[in-house]
Amino acid sequence: MPDSSLSNKGISKNFKIMLVILFLMEFARGMYVLSYVNYLPTVTSIAVAVTSAALSIHFISDAATNFVIGFLLKKFGTKLVLTLGFLLAFISLFLVIWFPTNPIVIILSAIMLGIAVSPIWVIMLSSVEEAQRGKQMGYVYFAWLLGLLVGWAFMNVLVKLHPTRFAFMMSLVVVIAWVLYYFVDIKLTNYNTKPVSEQLGQIVDVMKRHLVLFPGILLQGASISALLPILPTYATKVVGVSTIEYTIAIAIGGAGCAFSMLFLSKIIDKNSKGFMYAVIFTGFILFTAFIFGLSLVTNILIVWIVAIFIGLMYGILLPAWNTFMAGQIDPAEQEETWGVFNSVQGFGSMIGPLFGGLIAQFSNGLNNTFYFSAAIFLVLAIFYGVYFVKYRGKANRF
C-alpha cells in the first residue's frame, strides 16, 4: 500500500482516503455534538443543563483520550485501536436511534464519541510529510472544518424535518468511515511496549521539552471558544440580526478559512522559517484587531466582512502554527507528542466558554468577553514575537 503521506507528485491514494475518513468522523461529530444535542431542548422535554453537560463531557473525554492515545497506538497497534474507536463511535450513535431523548444515553454517547475520534486525529497529524507540512496541514484542517460544518448544517435540515427520525444517519456515516479504513495501510514511527510508569514519565518529558509551545496551544483555543457562549446573543441583541443572518456570518467565516487552508497554506512550505514566524505574529496581531473590532460593530455587512477576513487569516495561521509546532517534535515520538498537544488544546477549548460566559454574566456586558479574547491574542503576539526575535538572533550567531 502507498505510504500515508504526500508524495512528490501530490497526495497519495492512502492519504486521500485518510482525509475522507477524518471528514466523515468529523461530519458525524458535527451532526451529533453541534446540531442534534443543541437542538433537543427546543423540541423535546430534555433540559438545557443535560445537553450542556453532554457537550462539556464530550470535549473532556476527547482531551483526556488525546493525552494517552499516542502511547496506546504504539503499544497495541493502529488496527486494534482504530477498530475499537470506530466500534465505540458506532455504538454511541446507534444508541441514540433507540433512545433519542434519554439523558443518560445523550451524555454517554457524547463521552464515547469524544474518545472514538481521538486516534484518527493523532494518526493524521503524525503521518504528514515534513517537506510539505504546511500544505498537508491545510488539507487536514480543511477536512476537519468542512466535516464539522457540513455535518452541522446537514443535521440542522434533518431535525427540522423531524427531531429524531433521522438519527440513524449519524451512525451510518461512521459505518462508511469504518469500511474505508480497511482500504488504507497506516504505519507509525515505531512500536513499543513500554510500561505505564515509563509512559507517564515520557508524557512529563514531552511537556517539559515543549513548554514554549503551551501558551499558544492552550490560549488560542481558549480565546476563540470564549466567544462561543456570547456570539448568538451578540448577533441577535446587539447587531439585531436573524438566526439565518448569523448563520451566514459563520458560513462566510468558514468559507474564508477553507479557501485559505486549501490554497494559501501551501506558501508556508515555499518560504523560510522567518516567513512562517511573520505569519504567526501577524496572525495574532490581526486577530487582536478583528476581535476587538467586533465589539464596535453593529452593522451586519461589516460583520460579514470581518468574518471573511478572520476566516482567511485563521486558515493560514493554523497551518503555520502547526508547522512551527511540528518543527519542535522528535520524529520518533510524533504520536505521543501530538496526542499531548491535542489534549492541551482541548483543555483550552473547554475553559474558554467557561471564562467567556462568566465574564459576560458578572460584568453585565458582552463587550468584555471580546476584550478578554482580544487581549489573549495580544499577549500571544508579544510572547511569540519576542521568542522569534531571540531565536533568530541565536541562529544568526551560529
Curated annotation (Swiss-Prot):
Cell compartment(s), UniProt: Cell membrane
Tell me which PROSITE patterns the record gives.
MFS (PS50850)
Biological-process GO terms, alphabetical = lipid transport; lipoteichoic acid biosynthetic process
Say if the entry is tagged with keyword Transport.
yes
Provide the primary localization.
membrane
By its UniProt entry, which SUPFAM superfamilies does this protein fall under? Answer: MFS general substrate transporter
Question: A single Gene Ontology molecular function, please?
Answer: antiporter activity
Give, as in the UniProt entry, the pathway in which the protein acts. Cell wall biogenesis; lipoteichoic acid biosynthesis
| Membrane-spanning parts | 15-34, 46-73, 80-99, 105-126, 138-159, 165-184, 211-231, 243-263, 275-294, 300-320, 340-363, 369-389
Q: Which GO terms describe its cellular component?
A: plasma membrane
- Keywords for this protein: Antiport, Cell membrane, Lipid transport, Membrane, Transmembrane, Transmembrane helix, Transport, Virulence
Bilayer topology? Multi-pass membrane protein
Q: Does the keyword RNA-binding apply?
A: no
Query: What is its biological role?
Result: Proton-coupled antiporter flippase that catalyzes the translocation, from the inner to the outer leaflet of the cell membrane, of the lipid-linked disaccharide (anchor-LLD) that anchors lipoteichoic acids (LTA) to the cell membrane.
What's the family? Belongs to the major facilitator superfamily. LtaA family.
Alphabetical list of NCBIfam families matching this protein: MFS_flip_LtaA
Name the UniProt record assigns to this protein: Proton-coupled antiporter flippase LtaA
Q: Which organism is it from?
A: Staphylococcus haemolyticus (strain JCSC1435)
